Amino acid sequence: MSIDINWDTITGGTEGSARAEKIRAFIHDRFQQITLPRFIRSVHVHSFDFGSVPPEIEIKDICDPLPDFYEDDEDYPDEEGDEAENEAEDATPGAGDKLRDSSNPSNRPSRDSQSRERGRGAEGPVGRSIDHNQLRPSQPPARPSTKRSSLAPNELGSPFFPGALTPGIPGGTSNMNYFHLPLSAGLSGAATPLAAVAGAQLHSWLDNPHRPSTPTNMRLRHAASVNSLTLTPQSHPDPTSRPSSRHQHDEGKRQSFAGSDDGASPHGYTRTPSASPHRMHEKSPEDIQVVTHVQYSGNIKMSLTAEILLDYPMPSFVGIPLKLNITGLTFDGVAILAYIKKRAHFCFLSPDDADALVGSDIGFNGLQTDAQGQNPRPVQRPKIGGLLEHIKVESEIGGQGSGKQVLKNVGKVESFVLEQVRRIFEDEFVYPSFWTFLV
């Protein structure tokens, strides 16, 4: 199934200009947080334009939302709280201004204690929630490895393991079976955890020791075992800390159960309850998630200025502006859009997850022959989900009309800026990071 997008309606008019300005301001703010190399003094983003070429979107699957999308944000309650806020806004003048001000990170209370744990032993920076057309990223910083060989007995039938079988109920209890579309036939189930969420049986990829790791496995394991007891050394009595590997996790459970019989741990540990789990939204039959293949090769534009420092005749003697104009890019990725109550969650998948999900039917791209038209050989299409595959950039140095370019760091500056653009996109939009629209 394909979708026709009225690109002019989305990007044109005053609303389109406002969206472009928000994106420009967001990218500019992110560049101000980046540690610049010594030869660059500053980077400024001046303009952003969507261009006239729309992306190509193809629906690949319709299924249940990912478990992470059900996690509650304590600063922004669910629809019952939203209705109460709307009533209060109608009754109290100026209440809407206070609610809008809450989207400004400088006006919001600290959320260090409310940061989402992604099962990686570190807290990522919290995002911002924005009213209606504004967005909120949920961004963990890193993606460590974790392995899991089998399900614990208490995890069978857990709502956080949609593919796990519930005793006595064939096929499990998920309200929508992920094997219902043909695209899942090409999934081996041993590629990534997201393949299990989007089409493979859970126990298959859990039993495969060679499965690549993503944070979804640890995320689901933590959600399913939040009621178990963990052991914390007396020298570190932080109840919020928890084991970061399966070995430590299982060892803690074994010692916890042994301590219940002996009254004390033989290693001098004290038994403390694990951190309370995040409150999860209740699942509804109306919840839906759409998996799409997004391709774009257009004339999107962005203008940046990087100030290059000259070290002659002395270090950092003078700065010369280098203007970079991004005039287009090529994009290929798999996007997820989930609608749960009054929230729409959006993200892209990493190349490994995307290839495991929808890459099985697009690997062959015809035959190619040599110059004499002989020796045909198959041509493999590039792996799906490569995200930002190519960025077109033009550079201008100093004032116009000089006609000379004598700086040696121009290539380094271009490479640095483009790499940061890629990194900003991957950090903000690639799962397990996602954005939330309040609709």
From Swiss-Prot:
BP terms from Gene Ontology: mitochondrial genome maintenance; mitochondrion-endoplasmic reticulum membrane tethering; phospholipid transport; protein insertion into mitochondrial outer membrane
Gene Ontology CC: endoplasmic reticulum membrane; ERMES complex
Biased composition (Acidic residues): 69-90
Membrane topology, from the record: Peripheral membrane protein
Any one Gene Ontology molecular-function term assigned to this protein's record: lipid binding
Compositionally biased spans, kind Polar residues: 229-243
Record's compositionally biased regions (Basic and acidic residues): 109-121
Keyword tags: Endoplasmic reticulum, Lipid transport, Lipid-binding, Membrane, Mitochondrion, Mitochondrion outer membrane, Transport
InterPro entries, alphabetized: Mdm12, SMP_LBD
Location of the region described as Disordered in the Swiss-Prot/TrEMBL record: 65-165, 229-284
Domain of life: Eukaryota
Keyword Repeat: no
Principal subcellular localisation of the protein: mitochondrion
Subcellular location: Mitochondrion outer membrane; Endoplasmic reticulum membrane
Domain called SMP-LTD: residue spans: 1-439
Similarity comment: family membership: Belongs to the MDM12 family.
HAMAP family reported for this sequence: Mdm12
Assembly and interaction partners: Component of the ER-mitochondria encounter structure (ERMES) or MDM complex, composed of MMM1, MDM10, mdm12 and MDM34. A MMM1 homodimer associates with one molecule of mdm12 on each side in a pairwise head-to-tail manner, and the SMP-LTD domains of MMM1 and mdm12 generate a continuous hydrophobic tunnel for phospholipid trafficking.
Domain notes: The SMP-LTD domain is a barrel-like domain that can bind various types of glycerophospholipids in its interior and mediate their transfer between two adjacent bilayers.
Protein role: Component of the ERMES/MDM complex, which serves as a molecular tether to connect the endoplasmic reticulum (ER) and mitochondria. Components of this complex are involved in the control of mitochondrial shape and protein biogenesis, and function in nonvesicular lipid trafficking between the ER and mitochondria. mdm12 is required for the interaction of the ER-resident membrane protein MMM1 and the outer mitochondrial membrane-resident beta-barrel protein MDM10.
Name the record gives this protein: Mitochondrial distribution and morphology protein 12
Organism: Pyrenophora tritici-repentis (strain Pt-1C-BFP)
Gene assigned in the entry: mdm12
